[in-house]
């Protein structure tokens, strides 16, 4: 295959409604192109004025995805990494806030030589420079850029104008726009309606952009007649109208797009020839394992503070999909509201009936903390597999201090600055930090693992690198006491000072980690801790089933005489 001389650009936009899945579309297309032997990267442009999503509420933004180099980014970058098996970075997520900040800083430095600084040309030029810089500094064939928001949003206009100008600058065959729209199915009329898509394209034309390809989300498959109609009214060949109906799992999307020949249309429009056929055997096998698990199903409870909005735990949910497939089981998830467990009359046995493991999720602040601690206590005492991530690990050490080490006033200084026993305390280098945004311990750090621990059994190695996002750490003043009472500190920083992994020795599977393993789980590289946790939950479920079967068996066997008849007859 002849490599393109210049980096080719694909811009993905969305219309009609939000949350259509531009991130999944971008990731799926990137995976298909990579499987053909092309070098592909994906980036996300977000129109909000925040510099990054690090200080945004999970209820508004969902999960904050952390990269190896410490960027706090949009959750769509998680999809990019999981689908492409490629790491993203600081440059993979650009917000309008970062653009404006850069422009204002340049104005203060006198870089514009006294000019009146305006959206056109200064803001637009700043965006175009970022676009060109990402392509120039990468060893790429294709750069996919997802533009957040929906066509018609005021805040997206600078990104769209920059895309329009860049397409003119680069010339034909170097940049295409894929527009994702929605074709609603009206049940009363038993009909798919194309008018919203037509209006969305009209708005895109209004800012000077003719989409090159339309991808139409719908509940039902698009017929050839519908594609012809959409193409006719949107200035497109019907072959450039791609149908994308609902599917059982997001991991089927690449296979559906392959069937619709989206990748072939993209390569033709970009003038790329001689590419190989996509190798997707592993991907098909993975999808079959997700849809048709061979060893049944299990249920894992996720105890968290933001359970009303599952996107706050997006990477955890996807890691369970990967670990379920690697264990040949379906992992069902039940979201457990931490605050509910703080009620004195809360019935844990009833709430956790049918649950085979408990994960206590990350978070910030004191809301729901006592509920999390009670869930952890129940998991420890009932020998239920437990996994604590970041705040979940910190809560596990507080619970252990209170109920095993008899330190009844144990707490974290995040929740009680005057805690008598500060099991969790602010990291030393954080004590002088005043700003909130981008100031935590962020990114990938090494961790040394203890031989013979559950962590070592999972990883099968002594040195790992994991991603972090925290300000607080375990207080080493209590380390000796905890070890005497049965806790194993199985993972630490290389200097041994920062506790990364804790375990309870006499428990079937009780592990807490300071880092975020969910951020490194991928389709082709399930995270070892999630695989091990799901395996423990599967074993626990089998034990419960065997106990249930034993209970259902008769409690006595009749005594038979020599003729084989019951003596009681």
UniProtKB/Swiss-Prot annotation:
Allosterically activated by GTP, when glutamine is the substrate; GTP has no effect on the reaction when ammonia is the substrate. The allosteric effector GTP functions by stabilizing the protein conformation that binds the tetrahedral intermediate(s) formed during glutamine hydrolysis. Inhibited by the product CTP, via allosteric rather than competitive inhibition. Mg(2+) binds at residues 76, 146. Pathway: Pyrimidine metabolism; CTP biosynthesis via de novo pathway; CTP from UDP: step 2/2. Gene3D superfamilies: 3.40.50.880, P-loop containing nucleotide triphosphate hydrolases (3.40.50.300). UTP binds at residues 18, 193-198, 229. Residues 1-272 are annotated as: Amidoligase domain. PROSITE patterns: GATASE_TYPE_1. One of its GO terms (biological process) is pyrimidine nucleobase biosynthetic process. The active site is at 390 (nucleophile), 516, 518. The keyword ATP-binding applies. Keywords: ATP-binding, Glutamine amidotransferase, Ligase, Magnesium, Metal-binding, Nucleotide-binding, Pyrimidine biosynthesis. Belongs to the CTP synthase family. This is CTP synthase. It comes from Chlorobium chlorochromatii (strain CaD3). The gene is pyrG.
